[in-house]
């Protein structure tokens, strides 16, 4: 996601990661609303087999410059190369519809600007993958949904997602994804057969 324009340029002091106030609020919006748009950026059951603690994909609602366990990265760049600055939201997978994904990501960032959200401190030095659930709670670090079912319900309850996509598309996606999740829950996989049939 690139922010452009005189007010949105990312060119503050290095202490601020060269993020303007507007950029920080945009990033705060991404972090706040990521759980609500996860059903769009990660739309299938198997998407959540990638979004697991200790995996390569980030699930923790935090940000940093080089910490691979955070949801958003703000890679460094040379002071004279402001155009190279960017925010990297690292959770979307290739199955996402790019039009819907960009719509909800932009809406989340713009909501952060409109709500004047304060950006949390970056998490540079901690390997969040190594923290227990209790540690995460104590530090106030939330996570993305753990399943498609959880993601769909957060999406269904989101006023921002409904306003962004419109009632018709929002309701259709909720119904379709709930049906997909219900089908999956009733399916007995080969792994379950191999694991449990012999001990019954």
Each predicted region: which residue ranges?
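Single conserved hydrophobic/aromatic residue that forms the stacking wall/gate
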Residues: 1-10
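Catalytic-core signal marking the mid-to-C-terminal active-site face
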Residues: 12-200
């Amino acid at each position: 996601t690139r922010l452009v324009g005189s007010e949105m340029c990312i060119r503050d002091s290095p202490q601020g990661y060269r993020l303007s106030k507007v950029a920080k609020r945009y990033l705060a919006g991404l972090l706040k609303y990521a759980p609500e748009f996860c059903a769009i950026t990660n739309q299938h059951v198997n998407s959540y087999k990638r979004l697991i603690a200790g995996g390569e994909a980030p699930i923790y609602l935090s940000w940093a410059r080089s910490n691979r366990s955070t949801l958003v990265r703000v890679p460094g760049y040379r002071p004279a190369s402001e155009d190279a600055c960017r925010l990297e939201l690292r959770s979307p997978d290739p199955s996402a519809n790019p039009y819907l994904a960009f719509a909800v990501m932009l809406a989340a960032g713009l909501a952060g600007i409109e709500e004047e959200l304060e950006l949390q401190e970056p998490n540079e030095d901690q390997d969040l993958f190594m923290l227990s659930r209790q540690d995460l709670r104590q530090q106030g670090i939330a996570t993305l949904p753990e399943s498609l079912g959880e993601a769909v319900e957060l999406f269904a309850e989101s006023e921002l997602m409904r306003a962004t996509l419109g009632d018709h598309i929002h309701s259709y996606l909720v119904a379709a994804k709930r049906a997909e999740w219900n089908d999956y829950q009733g399916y007995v996989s080969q792994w379950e057969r191999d694991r449990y049939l012999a001990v019954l």
